[in-house]
Amino acid sequence: MSTGAQRAVLAAAATAALALGVAACGEEHESTVVEGEPLELGELSFNVQLTRFLNPDDTEDSEYLEGLAVPPPGEDYLAVFMDVENEGDEATTLPSDGEVEVEDTTGAKAEPVETDSLFALQLGEPIPAGGEIPTADSAAASGPVQGSFLLFLVPEGVTENRPLELKIRSHGEEGAIELDL
């Protein structure tokens, strides 16, 4: 092989190696899915089934909001119903309060509202190997949506800044679920 051909082969190999290195540098453990598709973060799979505003004056919704005050003027309760599966061989924990938020296109964020509802997803709780939340024998699993919910207090006009995303950090990985509102 001539010197010019060797240089061309070496240049092509160097370019390919550089491109691979640059691509790997930007690689993050973040993914985005749409509501209804599972978001895989480590061993946990998060699947949002339904997102909707809750009305404290509605009979069904009042059960979800039991013990909570009526939202202040200009704000609404937003419920994100989901199930979570631990697809791993070991027990793990759900993300904590500070690892879950709803964000709109302006960057405005809302953190989960603490609730004692039987239907609520209890952040930070353990989930056994192969386990699923809600558990089969729970109120959330037998409820109308058959999922546990996270509750957020958001401004009334938040739908003007769609899409909203549920952002989750879990065990060193990050992802987002685009909510269907």
Where is each model-derived feature located?
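Bacterial N-terminal signal peptides that target proteins for export
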Residues: 1-12
